[in-house]
Amino acid sequence: MDELKKETQNADATPRANLSTRALMAILIVVAVGIGFGKIVGVDSVPDRTMQNYKLAQIPKTMEERSKALRDKGVVGERYDAEMQRIYNALLADASKARPTLCANDRSRWATIRALVEKDARVYRFVPDVSSAEINARLKELQEKGIVDDGRITFKYYPEEILVNCAANAPERFEKKNMKAKRYVKKLVPYAIDKAWETPGWDSIDVVKHGLSDEVWRPENPSSGYLYSSKPPLLPTVMAAPYWVLHNVFGLSLVKEPFLTARILLVFYNLIPLAIAFLCLARVVDSLGGSEWTKIFVLASAIFGFFCLSYVATLNNHVPGFAAISIALWAACEILLSGRTSGWYYICAGFFGAFAVACDLPAAAFALFLCVALLAKKPKKTILSAIPAGLVVAAAFLATNYIAHGIWTPAYAHKRDHMDLQRSLAGEKGNDSDSNEVKFSFDPNDWYYYAYYPAGRPREMRYAALSHWANRSGIDKGEPSIARYAFHSTIGLRGVFSLSPIWILSIIGAILWLFERRSVAGESAKEGDDASLTIGNKTRVTKLLAAMTLTLTVIFFWFFMTRDQGDRNYGGVCCSPRWFFPLAPLFALCLTPTLERCAKNRALRWIAYAALAWSVASAFYPTWTPWTSPWLYQIAVDGGLFTPY
C-alpha cells in the first residue's frame, strides 16, 4: 500500500506519458502540418467568393433580359449568337472575383513574384533614342531648372517622353500606328509591378512609386514613375524560383489557375519551412532537458500557442522569419550544447540568422547575439563559416534592393511622417480662409506620397488618384498616444501577453534561467565529473537564451513604440501583434524552467493549461484569414466598450 501511495504521489507531482517524448513530439508536428495543409487547401477570400457567387447567380436573369432586348431590336442568327456569347463572356469575367490572395499585404508580394516570372507581367519602358546634341541640350536645360543628383548633372528623360507597356497605354501600338520620327528603345524595369497591378483583383495599397535614375521623377504626375511592392525584394526573389518551375515547366499560372498555383506555392513558401522549424525546435527543446510533460508542453506552445499556423495560408515575411530563427537556434544549440564542430552548423547558424534579419529587420539584434555567442565558442570557425554565410544573405538583400530601386536602402526608409504632414496641411488650409482647395505636399524622396492611375481605369488625369498612404484612414492613421499604443500592444486588446498569456510564463522562465546558479537537472551531478561539465555547459546556454530573450523583448518594444504615428498601427488589420513574430521561438524555449516548477504543483499546472488554452484560442480565432482584428478587440467593439478604428 505504501508503494502504491508513493507512486500515486509521484504521478501527481510530475505527469508521465505512456509514449516516448520524441514520439509525442512527432505526433504534434504531424498534426500541425495537417492543420497547415488544410488551411492552405481552403485558402479563399471569403468576401470576394461571396460577391462572385452572387454575380454568378444573376447571370441567367441578365442573359434573359439581354436576349429579349436583342430580339426586340430584330437581331437574329449568327449576329445574335455572337452578341449573346460576348455578353456572357463579359458577365462571367465581371463575376470572377474569387482569389487566393487574402489582403493587400500578400498581393504586394505576389505581384512582385509575377513580375519576376511571367513575361506578360513584366514592365517595359520605351524611351526615345537621343543624339549627342539632344543630350547636351537636355543637360543644359536640367542645369537651368536645378534638377541634379548629388550635385551632378546627368541626362534625364521627362515623364511625357516615356511610354510604358500598360494595357491602357501600349507603346507597341503607338509605334506601329503613329510611326513617330524618333526611334524608341525598349528597356526592362526590373521588379516594377504596374502590369501585374492591372490584373483584376491584383491591386494593392502596399506599394510605393518612384522613377529611375535617368528620369525626372514627379510624384504629382500619375504618368511619372513605376509601382513597386513596398516590401524588400529579396524574399519575393527567393520565392520566385518555385513559381518559375511551376510556370515554365508545368505551365501553371497565378492568373489562369490562381487557386491551384497559389496552394502549391504556399506549401513550399510556408508549410515546409514551418515543418522544418518545428523539427528544429523539438530538437532544441529535447536538448535543453526537463520532464516529458515540460518538453511536450513547450513544443505544443510553440506550434499551437502562437500564430504560426494562423499565417500559413497567406504570403508573408513572418513565417519564413520564424523558420529562419528556429533553424539558426537549432544550429547554434548543436554547437553550444552538443559540441558539434562541423562547419555546416556554423554555416546554417550564420545564413539563417541573417535571413531572419532579411525577413524581419528587428531580428538584427538576434543575429548579433548569435554571432557573439559563436565567436566566444569558436572564433575561427565563426569567422570562416558563419559570418561569410551571413554576408551572402546581406549581399543578396542589398543587391536585389539596388536592382529594384537603384538605391541601397529599402523602400520603407523613403517616407515621411504622413500623419504629421496631414495635420500640417490641415493647419495651413485652416489659416487660408480664401482657399477651399485640398493641399498636397509632394516630395520626390517620399515614395509613399504620389498620384497614380487606378487599375482598370483609363490613364487620363480625371481618373488619377492619390496614394492610400497620403490619405490614410482607419487603423492606418496609427495610434496618436504612445502610452495607449504600449498598453494595447502588451496587455490590451491587441497585446502580445493578453492574446498569448503563455508568454508571460516565458518571461518568468527567462528571469529564472538568468539568475539560477545551476540547471535544475544538474542538482545530483558531482563537481568535476562529465555530467557536471555537461550541466555547466547547459547552464551557460540557458543563461544566453534568457539574456537574448529579455534583451530582444526590450529592443523590440522600444523599436516599435518609438515609431512615427503612422507606423503605430498594430501591424494593420491582423489577428496578432505580428511585429513580435521573431520572439516566438525564444519565448517557447524560455517556458522550460517555469514549466518544470509548474509540473510539481497541480494548481500551477492548471494555470499553465489555462494560459495555453487562451493562447490557442487567440491563434485559431481567425478562421479564413489572419488579416482580421483580434478576438479581444472584436468583443470589445461588439460590446460597445471600444470605438472601432
Regions found by a protein language model. Give the residues of each.
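Membrane-lumen/periplasm interface segments of specific transmembrane helices
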Residues: 383-509, 552-560, 614-629
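Membrane-interface alpha helices of multi-pass inner-membrane proteins
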Residues: 113, 298-299, 303, 344-360, ...
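Signature aromatic-anchored transmembrane alpha helix within multi-pass, membrane-resident enzymes
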Residues: 20-29, 348-351, 367-368, 387-395, ...
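Start-transfer (signal-anchor) and selected internal transmembrane alpha helices
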Residues: 1-88, 266, 286-287, 381-389, ...
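Interfacial juxtamembrane loops and adjacent helix segments
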Residues: 48-110, 115-268, 415-483, 564-568
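Perimembrane helix-loop-helix junctions
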Residues: 334-338, 365-399, 418-419, 509-523, ...
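Membrane-interface transmembrane helices that cradle and orient dolichyl/undecaprenyl
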Residues: 8, 12, 289, 318, ...
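Transmembrane-helix signature of polytopic, membrane-embedded enzymes
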Residues: 252-257, 276-304, 322-323, 342-345
